[in-house]
Curated annotation (Swiss-Prot):
Alphabetized Pfam families for the sequence: ATP-grasp_2, Ligase_CoA
Gene Ontology terms: cellular component: cytosol; succinate-CoA ligase complex
PROSITE patterns tied to this protein: ATP_GRASP, SUCCINYL_COA_LIG_3
Residues where Mg(2+) binds: 199, 213
Protein name (Swiss-Prot/TrEMBL): Succinate--CoA ligase [ADP-forming] subunit beta
The reaction(s) this protein catalyses: succinate + ATP + CoA = succinyl-CoA + ADP + phosphate; GTP + succinate + CoA = succinyl-CoA + GDP + phosphate
Encoding gene, per UniProt annotation: sucC
Source taxonomy: Bacteria, Bacillati, Bacillota, Bacilli, Bacillales
Assembly notes: Heterotetramer of two alpha and two beta subunits.
Key words, A-Z: ATP-binding, Ligase, Magnesium, Metal-binding, Nucleotide-binding, Tricarboxylic acid cycle
Cofactor(s) for this UniProt protein: Mg(2+)
SUPFAM superfamilies, per database record: Glutathione synthetase ATP-binding domain-like (SSF56059), Succinyl-CoA synthetase domains (SSF52210)
Cofactor note as given: Binds 1 Mg(2+) ion per subunit.
Domain ATP-grasp per the UniProt entry, residue ranges: 9-244
């Protein structure tokens, strides 16, 4: 689950992480009032969307007086920002963060992530702050420094100081920077975050170490422990299909392709997307119906896939263990009949009750293409949508 920058900063403040004073605004008048309350000569008007790259897209402006605050707020509110993370459709700006300007002496990057390669939490830091960290990693990997964190001891002081030295934090601010990093790590752990990214972390002219931007994402599986985080959810920022899928406990992520995929099991779902790509297709989604899906759940999953107008065909790939193939078959047939399916449908079934499942599909009267293997199914659906 993602939250807005201003919400992330409020959480970090609770852990002693220093951030600029700011106010959220939903209208131009609220933006001007917020700037008045802050009482500084320079304010920053920042679009609040769940995506990076806002500055390059015109979503971050420095205002030197109240008239400029009004002008920039008018320009940004309601604007559709298109960044490298939003996709070509962009995101409409419905709220702003009005923040005190600060005297930036140097920008850095600090982030806490889950590293799949080591199976550990890793704190990363770089002197190349304010930039796309993926770009830095690709072009100048030697400029990114990492510390693997032992989950028992947590981030140690010496590790934080080592990172601060590595990225050339001024010597007199090393301890401040180390404290900042340790507070960031504690927030990451306490809130079950999946990423906590500060880009940029800045050193100011008056010797402060401050988070100028903050990105916090949270593990959806742990949200039951954090009703305070759930309350921060902004449904306007989420894909409607993903919201609908969550109501039925379906794991759905919209992608940019045209082949809908319905699979049971996250590993098989990823393998299915890979093999569709291998045969020249583009998956339209990741969709895991889980091991204990009911007919209703399968039917809803099918409907959600077909809400995507880009979908030109569907590949159902099921290995029945806990999930029974006849349940999947009934769900597919019911959904196809309800929505009067007129797009290619390839189904591969294996496992529990596979013969019964195939019988249900064969007797449905629907134009369903059977696949004998995952590769066979991927090849068939790719050829059918071309």
């Amino acid at each position: 689950m993602n939250i807005h920058e201003y919400q992330g900063k409020e959480i970090l403040k609770q852990y002693g992480v220093k951030v600029p004073e700011g106010r959220v605004a939903f209208t131009v008048e609220e933006a001007v009032e917020a700037a008045k309350e802050l009482g500084t000569q320079v304010n920053v008007v920042k679009a609040q969307i769940h995506a990076g790259g806002r500055g390059k897209a015109g979503g971050v402006k420095v205002a030197k007086n109240l008239d400029e605050v009004r002008t920039y707020a008018s320009e940004i509110l309601g604007k559709v920002l298109v960044t490298h993370q939003t996709g070509p459709e962009g995101k409409e700006v419905k709220r702003l963060l009005i923040e005190q300007g600060c005297d930036i002496k140097k920008e850095y990057y600090v982030g806490v992530v889950v590293d799949r390669a080591t199976g550990s939490v890793v704190m990363m830091a770089s002197e190349e702050g304010g930039m796309d960290i993926e770009e830095v990693a690709a072009n100048n990997p030697e400029k990114i420094f990492k510390e693997v964190v032992d989950p028992v001891t947590g981030l140690n002081g010496f590790q934080a100081r080592r990172l601060a030295y590595a990225i050339n934090i001024p010597k007199e601010l090393i301890n401040k920077a180390a404290k900042f990093m340790m507070s960031l790590y504690q927030a990451f752990v306490d809130k079950d975050a999946s990423i906590a990214e500060i880009n940029p972390l800045v050193v100011t002219g008056d010797g402060e170490v401050m988070a100028l931007d903050a990105k916090l994402n949270f593990d959806s599986n742990a949200l039951y422990r954090h009703p305070d985080i759930v309350a921060l959810r902004d449904l306007d920022e989420e894909d409607e299909k993903e919201i609908e899928a969550s109501k039925f406990d379906l794991s759905y992520i919209a992608l940019d392709g045209n082949i809908g995929c319905m699979v049971n099991g996250a590993g098989l779902a990823m393998a299915t997307m890979d093999i569709v790509k291998f045969y020249g297709g583009d998956p339209a989604n990741f969709l895991d119906v889980g091991g204990g899906a009911t007919e209703e759940k399968v039917t809803e999953a099918f409907k959600i896939i077909l809400r995507d107008e880009k979908v030109k065909g569907i590949f159902v790939n099921i290995f029945g263990g806990i999930m029974k193939c006849d349940v999947i078959a009934n769900g597919v047939v019911n959904a196809a009949k309800q929505i009067k399916l007129d797009k290619p449908l390839v189904v591969r079934l294996e496992g529990t009750n596979v013969d019964l499942g195939k019988k249900i599909l064969n007797e449905s009267g629907l134009n369903i293409v059977a696949a004998e293997s995952m590769a066979d199914g991927a090849e068939k659906i790719v050829s059918l949508v071309k």
